[in-house]
Amino acid sequence: MNVKVENIEKNVVKLEITVDSEKFNEAVKKSFKKNAKRFNVPGFRKGKAPLNIIKKYYGEGVLFEDAINFCCEDTYPKAIEENNIKPVDYPQIDVVQIGEGKDFIYTAEVTTVPEVKLGEYKGVEVKKVSYEVEDEAVENELKSMQEKNARVFLKEEGEIEKGNIAIIDFKGYVDGKAFEGGEAKDYEIEIGSGTFIGDFEDQLVGLKKDESKEVNVSFPEEYGREDLNGKPATFEVTIKDIKVKELPALDDEFAKEVSEFDTLEELKSDIKDRMKKELSEKAKAEYEEAVVEAVGANAEIEIPKVMIEKEIENMVRDLEMRLKYQGLDLKSYYEFTNSSEEKVKEYMRETAEKRVKTDLIMQEIAKVEDIKATEEELKEKAMEVAKQYGQKDVEKTAELIANAQKSYLEIDIVNGKVLDLLVENSKEIA
């Protein structure tokens, strides 16, 4: 095998790879073995005609397609390894020379990992991030717990008041016509919750069970549906039932019922401690992100478009998986959000570029600092991931993960070490 390398443009190289005629003939024979059964030649049972007859009957090129694939699969990986080329995508293969008794020559044009010029990455100055737990946040959490433990019962007599729950049938019209998604029966709505648009809920105050009313509202300009944005609408509403929500008193008895604590003060203290922990983790994550951004701002990289496009595709696949768990698909998501594949991808572009840049910087720092993942760390990481699957045989699952996802585990471990290095060497400023 002979290889010539030509730099076509920045981050794009073309390899001209020559496979000697003997090797190519072996690939042709291999192709014949693979395809022999599909050839039907008069005078021979199907699949039994010899190679020389097949060539005469069908032409020598009939076996070239698979022979080319065999040669490329064998020689291309060796060529990029020998020339220290790190591709970021599949190559564009073009045949230069092919034929019986000839050397097989082809070119492989491929985009490569870009050069990363690191700037200052140790000692970057980053503003301190900190959060305090507000008393209001604790009170809001208590109110939320109070709401979850409220007693709800039917209101036998009287009108709808703020805070009541109305059971309604409704049908909406825009421009005199019913619209999709504008109708429901036995719908529960808490008056004053702001669930519905405009003052829809306020217009129900004062109504009694079995009464009906036309409610007039306007959809917000940015409602998210072109057929409804900014348009006035009329809803025919019928009150089916009225419910009253009775909140439990916030006292020691409440604390005993909803927690392991004996007093309300102990419950408040626990809520505050949990919030402190959450805010501390949030501050840590934001500080780490700020450190990485500062390091990124000091680096120079010309990212190939194909890397960004690949990351966008990964993000779309992740979105598709998340939607699947919710019983949705991409088509439904696009319709619901009044979007499209093109709009979503464009929205993801900035984040994708940021992710690719960060990954490249982390890899380059790991290379400069000689940061690697040890076998012990790989085992621990695999075990950590395996436990999340909830399988009985965790050790066996970890072993499977370690083998199948080794490269991903290594990247995760190395990136974590690089992040620790950057944070430890950063300068926190007020």
From Swiss-Prot:
Its main location: cytoplasm. Its EC number is 5.2.1.8. Gene3D superfamilies: 3.10.50.40, Trigger factor ribosome-binding domain, Trigger factor, C-terminal domain. InterPro entries: PPIase_dom_sf, PPIase_FKBP_dom, Trig_fac, Trigger_fac_C, Trigger_fac_C_sf, Trigger_fac_ribosome-bd_bac, Trigger_fac_ribosome-bd_sf, Trigger_fact/SurA_dom_sf. It is found in: Cytoplasm. It is an enzyme of class 5 (isomerase). GO terms for cellular component: cytoplasm. Keywords: Cell cycle, Cell division, Chaperone, Cytoplasm, Isomerase, Rotamase. The keyword Cell cycle applies. Pfam families: FKBP_C, Trigger_C, Trigger_N. GO terms for molecular function: peptidyl-prolyl cis-trans isomerase activity; protein folding chaperone; ribosome binding. It catalyses: [protein]-peptidylproline (omega=180) = [protein]-peptidylproline (omega=0). One of its GO terms (biological process) is protein transport. SUPFAM superfamilies: FKBP-like, Triger factor/SurA peptide-binding domain-like, Trigger factor ribosome-binding domain. Belongs to the FKBP-type PPIase family. Tig subfamily. PANTHER family: TRIGGER FACTOR CHAPERONE AND PEPTIDYL-PROLYL CIS/TRANS ISOMERASE, TRIGGER FACTOR-LIKE PROTEIN TIG, CHLOROPLASTIC. Involved in protein export. Acts as a chaperone by maintaining the newly synthesized protein in an open conformation. Functions as a peptidyl-prolyl cis-trans isomerase. Consists of 3 domains; the N-terminus binds the ribosome, the middle domain has PPIase activity, while the C-terminus has intrinsic chaperone activity on its own. This is Trigger factor. The lineage of its organism: Bacteria, Bacillati, Bacillota, Clostridia, Eubacteriales.
